[in-house]
Amino acid sequence: MNRYKNGKIFSLFLMCGILGACDKFEAIPLEYKSTPLEEAQEEVLNTIDPAWELELMETNGYVMAFKDKKYDKLFTRTLGWNGGDGVLTTLLPDGNAFWSFNDSFYGVVEGETRARKDCSFPRNSIMVQTPGDEEENLVWLADFVQTTTPEAPRYYQARTHIRHPKASLSDDKIQEGEIDQDWLYWAGDATVCNNKLQVLWNGVDNTNPDALMRHEGICLATYSLEGTPGDDNYMKLISADHHFNDVDIYGYGSTLWEDEDGHIYLYGSYNNYDMIVARTARHDLTSPWEYYVGDEQGNFSWQNTYPTEEEVKRSRIQETDCSMPWVFKKGDTYYMLAQAKWFGREMYIFRSDKPYGPFVDCKRLFGFSDFLDKLGDQTYQNLYMINLHPHLSRNGEL
């Protein structure tokens, strides 16, 4: 599996197909607004500012999907970060946006051919975007090996942002620019509490060549938001609790939803395609967690103990196999956006009357092309980690 293909950032407009609420696993029939389809599509097209550089990708009834070519260009880079996966974002109180990345390329790319030269491969990295969508709005918070001498080795290469305590490389090797490969962290979701950024980092064990990328444990890192980007204190790592949740193997908090009921809902998965959920006691990731678990009769309840595998097998919260769930709310209804299984090239949308499901009435929202807008071979292998960035919305779109 080639996990290092560059992804795209898509802008998805939800037009006038309004989804209703649901009760348990019985979905109430949908009632659509009477706006004629062509009129509704034209209305959306008329709201698009040409400066956004949106390119129509697919029309699916009242849903229109666009490629965001402006963000494609923004992340088509020749120096420093020039590709990666993960790519989660969190809106900060000052209007800036926190970006986390997993496996990334740092170094130099030839501008005309897009060929990578000498690049390093840090396993996680972070960035802050100030309001705006220009190059100067991207403040990269990487620990660069050296940025002064283009002819010298490791020019604009970077170190991994946060290391796993079990990683085996010596400090001298890290200073030289070497990257840990045995134990590492990949980003989970993040939130703000008491004007500090809380980020979940999922532990990854690569020590067994027959079972690579095994999830083990969660680290909770806390960052300062004092000052402005570029200040010494802004995004300074205050603490990293490497033993925050040593027993986690299902990635609770890979994505999250902060609800008005006072809880943070933390979504994970069993067997990649069974979505499961936990929640915090308060809007604070350090508050106690409880897990939503189904019994043998199919009745769900919240429990304080981490679920066993048998319990998790009974605790799926959605009706159709999918991956990487993103929950949001519109009106009185919660929606879950997720990717079809087996690296599927379709996106699904579900609905529920609760942030913990059940999420039902699965519908195909849109599909991805089999080709990328790039030089050379435009086909690609696996499509994964399709993430929702609600604060990038310009006009109410997803």
Give, region by region, the residue ranges found by the protein language model:
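Beta-propeller and closely related beta-sheet repeat lectin domains
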Residues: 85-88, 158-159, 186-191, 252-256, ...
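C-terminal motif of bacterial Sec signal peptides marking the signal peptidase cleavage site
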Residues: 20-21
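Sec-dependent N-terminal signal peptides
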Residues: 9-17
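Beta-rich carbohydrate-recognition and catalytic domains
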Residues: 25, 29-32, 36-80, 92-183, ...
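Repeat-based blade/solenoid architectures
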Residues: 319-321, 380-383
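Bacterial N-terminal signal peptides that target proteins for export
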Residues: 2-10
